[in-house]
């Protein structure tokens, strides 16, 4: 390891990035051993000052266009976008990408749920029938005198609209507190369907489509709600129904829980289908 690289890796005070003593010790050991982490790479990265203020646009091939955050309204991008529009477009693309990630995760969980209900997947089962009935009831599905399989299939068909519906309101909008839902309706941000909202946000943030930053940000709100009250909520509820609703447990945590004389298996992530 060169002296320059060693200085970059070991010249960081890891107490500035964590309050956890064991994490600080491990970060220091990794650096001393000559390996990079996100923290050392971040310290070595000098952010672009224009990009840091979201004043750079590269959504089309007439650019990239750089605007001056210190003198923001003296010029526009080639397409005529102001700095407000550029910032809104940049933020919109991040909202769309994050929403798509949660939406796809939720769809995977829902696809698995359908196959479990149909009996095509034998390794999983409906573990929490009470949660199944509560979720079904919350969105208007009848549960009295019906089998678990009947309720589950109706729940699948209803929740599928979270993703595929192109008009109306997503199913879990029925769970939103009435005053909050009224506010959303007045603002025009109740999600129709996750795919529709993400697609429209990508469309609006494209060059030559929507130059009004307020319109773009409004669609950001609708897409974010499609994520939180759609894709993410579906994933959470289906996970609980299949794997069981979490309950408080006493567990060991942190680096100090690893045992030197054991084979330690570390599970990372939130995709329960893999486990």
Model regions and ranges:
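Metallocofactor- and cofactor-centric catalytic cores in central/energy metabolism, strongly enriched
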Residues: 2-275
